[in-house]
């Protein structure tokens, strides 16, 4: 054993490159390429580009390849060349740098007649693109087939042609007139469509028509948002107030912030400050006169009706109480602004020539508000009693064509006298007239109030005795007593009518075997007519006063008892001939005929019981329908 260890060790083995295996240790430096490389955890496409990547200049553009018409044998070579040209770059898709549109372009271009159906495009993808070779089944092909259909309809380089054969899919061909590159996105071109341009043109034409016609509308101060997109920010392009060009805005108008896409808030009609001062009086202040009568009329309108009555009587008594020569003093004038006083003194066309301060003026008189509804003549008589030359009714010159209404008759008459002698004579005459007028007014007022009260009372409560029952046409009145009684019972339920009709029912059952005579029918109809007339007369007689239900119930019971007695007498009179007739029939007929007769009598009696049964208080108004 030990001798084996003493032998020499085997020689070193050499590698292919002449280096011993032991020398491959730490003496030689390791290559940098063997170091571990960092890798992203996600394997999604596209892969991240390296840091030192430079895009090659001679790269094959997909847009150039998409519009090239390739030969059938060059399609695979073109794909390989495209992949080889971009082997250093990251791939856009899992199968390479070509998009779906590029693959479809190669597929259509590889066909002999330059057209393929949708199913043929699918087959070309599976056969020529390695990525889709194992994805041809229906389960794994749903996604990329949907993408192919989407690209066919989206890009303008593809054109759909109807197939000549029936039941076959359409052909897809390359559009020679298509622009190179990708088609313009439809969403980006939505703001510059022809419809938008037409709308702008229509709006401008409408504005020009308004400018020419000179129409001033309600919204003229604000510009139209549709037609002011291309206009400047400092002009009103839509204003029809100015026929030529845009209207330059004043600096009082401020602008609002807006975008280029929307023009709704370009110009604001809100003024920065108020341009017109508030003068505090109406526009026609130069022609108006604030008179004493107008001021007092406004004060009187705020008072109540009772205060107006007392003021009217007090003014009539105080206005002409100076029979002994002592004139009454007018009330102090109300406050007036200075400009109104000057306008009154300068421009009043109704003022008389300067009465002296010592002259007397009569107390103003107005028409009371309550006398407007009545035919009151207090104001008319007062105006007629005065001389027309001495009365001045002050009206506002701003309304020269207006006629004073009953509300505006609260004006006063300023009577200016010429001397003390005429004053005394006129005062005595007017005092007498005024006393007479006052008495007449009081009489008219009392009479009118009494008449109104009586009229109201007569309208509210008319006596029922005025209703004439004698002239009432009773003969033409049709009344169903049975329905009337049923209605009354359904409303109140106070009527309790008990009619013992057992004897009548038994007599009618016994006599029902024979036929009813015409006299019975006529008697029944007469009884019903009499009962109707009696009920009508009773109802009409009780209509003048309040209806008493107890009296009506008693009357109905009496009438029904009388009808029962009459029916019993008629049944007794007709019972004997019916019995004789029944005996003859029983003797002549056999057993079969007797049984049929019994059935007939039973049916007749049941029908009669059904017709003449008094389950509710009712009166027979017509013969039964089964009687012929």
Swiss-Prot record:
Residues 338-351 have a biased composition (Low complexity). Gene3D superfamilies: Winged helix-like DNA-binding domain superfamily/Winged helix DNA-binding domain (1.10.10.10). The keyword Transcription applies. Residues 63-77, 221-230, 256-265, 402-414 have a biased composition (Polar residues). GO terms for biological process: cell differentiation; glucose homeostasis; negative regulation of cell growth; negative regulation of cell population proliferation; negative regulation of insulin receptor signaling pathway; regulation of DNA-templated transcription; regulation of lipid metabolic process. Transmembrane segments: none annotated. Residues 95-201 bind DNA. Residues 39-77, 182-205, 217-269, 316-359, 389-415 are annotated as: Disordered. One of its GO terms (molecular function) is DNA-binding transcription factor activity, RNA polymerase II-specific. SUPFAM superfamilies: Winged helix' DNA-binding domain. Keywords: Activator, Cell cycle, Cytoplasm, Developmental protein, Differentiation, DNA-binding, Growth regulation, Nucleus, Phosphoprotein, Transcription, Transcription regulation. Residues 328-337 have a biased composition (Pro residues). GO terms for cellular component: cytoplasm; nucleus. The modification Phosphothreonine is found at residue 44. It is found in: Cytoplasm; Nucleus. The modification Phosphoserine is found at residues 75, 190, 259, 262-263, 268. Transcription factor involved in the regulation of the insulin signaling pathway. Consistently activates both the downstream target Thor\d4EBP and the feedback control target InR. Involved in negative regulation of the cell cycle, modulating cell growth and proliferation. In response to cellular stresses, such as nutrient deprivation or increased levels of reactive oxygen species, foxo is activated and inhibits growth through the action of target genes such as Thor. Interacts with melt. This is Forkhead box protein O. It comes from Drosophila yakuba.
